[in-house]
């Protein structure tokens, strides 16, 4: 392996899959160990109506590409629609959350840079009964601060 990591192709239905924090499967496509710590990439399926609480990442930039479905984002206080095919970028320190507003699951590619957020997802998936308080407790040591409730509660449609 070089200092930069090794070239790799991760095909459809490949990668370690765990239960995501808002329900639905989360599949790692690239972890920090594979990318020399430069980024984490994962595919996530978001059930209808679901999404994380309002939060920010002090240490990570985050980006999404929406393969299927429709999400609604709250980005630094502004509500924005993200239909299928949308790309969303959120710089570190920006308050954000999202919600699947479609009647079917949404499928997204999520990237964090630098790598490290995979630790949050691994720890959350290991809980026997995940709850909203665990989201904040696990995220805080990783620089993720929960600021408010999910969009379904703060800004219902």
Regions found by a protein language model. Give the residues of each.
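Short, conserved beta-strand element in jelly-roll/cupin
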Residues: 41-47, 56-74, 111
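Short histidine-centered beta-strand/loop micro-motifs
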Residues: 30-31, 53-58, 99-101
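Ligand-binding loop in jelly-roll beta-barrel domains
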Residues: 35, 72, 92-118
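A short, N-terminal "cap"/entry segment at the start of jelly-roll beta-barrel domains
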Residues: 1-39, 126-157
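Hydrophobic small-molecule pocket/channel-lining residues, especially in calycin-type beta-barrels
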Residues: 50, 58, 71, 87-89, ...
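Short acidic-glycine-tyrosine-enriched beta hairpin
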Residues: 10-11, 70, 77-95
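Short strand-coil-strand connectors
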Residues: 22, 74-76
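Conserved hydrophobic/aromatic beta-strand scaffold that supports enzyme active sites
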Residues: 28, 41-45, 63, 79, ...
């Amino acid at each position: 392996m070089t200092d930069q990591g090794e070239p790799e192709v991760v095909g459809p239905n490949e990668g370690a899959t765990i239960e995501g924090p808002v329900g639905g499967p989360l599949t790692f496509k690239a972890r920090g160990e594979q990318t020399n710590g430069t980024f984490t990439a994962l595919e996530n399926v978001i059930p209808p109506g679901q999404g994380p609480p309002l939060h920010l990442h002090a240490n990570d930039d985050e980006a999404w590409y929406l393969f299927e479905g429709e999400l609604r984002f709250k980005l630094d206080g502004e509500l924005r629609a993200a239909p299928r095919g949308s790309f969303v970028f959120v710089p570190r320190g920006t308050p954000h959350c999202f919600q699947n507003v479609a009647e079917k699951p949404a499928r997204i590619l999520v990237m964090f840079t630098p790598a490290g957020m995979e630790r949050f997802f691994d720890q959350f998936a290991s809980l026997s009964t995940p709850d909203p308080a665990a989201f904040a407790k696990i995220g805080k040591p990783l620089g993720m601060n929960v600021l408010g409730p999910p969009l379904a509660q703060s800004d219902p449609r």
